[in-house]
Structures are given as structure tokens and as C-alpha cells.
């Protein structure tokens, strides 16, 4: 479905958005191997996920005519201290709006915010095959850095996972401390959301 891009609104998610976001995620769980979850999470569990991510990282939604039609978020990919400059990205869009560039816009916003947080590397774990996701990551200049064959089992088949990586800043000799998303200047965040 084509949409009027000037009517798109990008903003930070809130816990109150959980049920609407879950409506987008549900078909990915129930009908695809794009996510390795077997069961659709409850609204309460999803609220908790949003709350936890927003403690440190961005969780962005795209609204169109008062409906959430896409979302993207980042989170810490590994727990050891030396990995703190790395983040994993995820993006999901309502299938009815595929081909409108929503995923690209969400990713662009996410990456710009992560730069302000002093994140250096971003990663995406993409089930194989997933042509649309591969195109998205190629568009942003991600490199394929690993392929794990048969690493997940869903719907009676084994599925591989491709790891994509992108450096979003230089590799400083002494990296700056990571900032929580709440520590970023609100004016700068507003400008990024309106890119």
C-alpha cells in the first residue's frame, strides 16, 4: 500500500505502544523464520522489553494515520565490558506497507542516534534466506561477516543466520563512554527524528 511520506511520524516508543507494536511482530512469529521465537509474547512481556531497551538505547516507531506501521530498536549485543561500543539492531515493518522505505528511514534514525551515544559498531543477525533484509543492510553498507548454518530450528526446518556488521564511527584510541539515550540532547534527538 502506497502512503504519503509527509504524513509519517517517527518517535520514541512508549510502553503504551506495546499492543500496537505486537500486532506488527505477531505475523513474523507465527508465519516466518525471520524471528526464532515460537510463541507471540504477551503485551505485558512486550512492555517489559520496551522498558528495558529504553533504559539505554533507542526504540523508534513509525506512525501513519495514527497507526504504528514499523519499529526499530538497538540493544547491547554482548555483556562483557569490552563490547560496550557494539549494538545489535532490529527492524520490523507492517507487511501492508512494504516498499515504502519505512525500514530504511527507521534504520537511518537509529544509526544517527547510536552515533551520538558513542556506539562504534552495529550488528544485525538475519535469518537466511531473507532477501529484503539483505538488501536493507547492503544499502547501508553493512558487511557480511559470518554465516551460521542451521543455527535455528523452526517450522520443521533448520535455518541459517547471516551476521552483518558496520562501523558507524572511527575506531578511537580511547573511546568515549557510552551515553544512555536519555542523556542525549533532546533538540538533537528531535532533529534526527525529523530527518
Regions found by a protein language model. Give the residues of each.
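Acetyl-CoA-dependent GNAT
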Residues: 41-96, 107-108, 167-168
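Active-site acidic-Proline motif in GNAT/NAT acetyltransferases
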Residues: 91-96, 100, 112, 128-129
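Glycine-rich phosphate/pyrophosphate-binding loop shared by adenosine-nucleotide-utilizing enzymes
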Residues: 8, 67-71, 159
Amino acid at each position: 500500500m502506497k502512503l504519503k511520506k509527509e504524513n509519517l511520524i517517527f518517535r520514541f516508543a512508549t510502553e503504551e505502544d506495546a499492543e500496537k507494536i505486537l500486532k506488527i511482530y505477531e505475523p513474523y512469529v507465527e508465519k516466518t523464520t525471520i524471528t526464532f521465537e515460537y510463541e507471540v509474547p504477551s503485551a505485558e512481556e512486550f512492555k517489559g522489553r520496551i522498558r528495558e531497551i529504553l533504559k539505554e538505547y533507542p526504540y523508534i516507531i513509525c506512525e501513519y494515520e495514527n497507526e504504528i506501521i514499523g519499529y526499530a530498536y538497538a540493544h547491547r549485543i554482548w555483556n562483557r565490558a569490552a563490547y560496550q561500543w557494539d549494538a545489535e539492531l532490529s527492524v520490523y515493518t507492517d507487511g501492508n506497507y512494504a516498499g515504502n522505505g519505512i525500514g530504511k528511514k527507521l534504520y537511518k534514525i537509529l544509526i544517527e542516534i547510536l552515533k551520538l551515544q558513542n556506539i562504534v559498531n552495529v550488528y544485525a543477525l538475519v535469518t537466511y534466506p531473507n532477501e529484503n533484509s539483505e538488501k536493507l543492510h547492503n544499502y547501508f553498507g553493512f558487511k557480511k561477516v559470518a554465516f551460521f548454518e542451521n543455527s535455528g530450528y523452526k517450522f520443521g526446518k533448520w535455518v541459517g543466520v547471516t551476521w552483518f556488521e558496520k562501523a558507524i564511527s572511527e575506531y578511537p584510541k580511547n573511546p568515549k563512554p557510552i551515553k544512555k539515550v536519555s542523556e542525549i540532547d533532546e533538540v538533537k534527538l528531535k532533529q534526527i527524528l525529523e530527518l
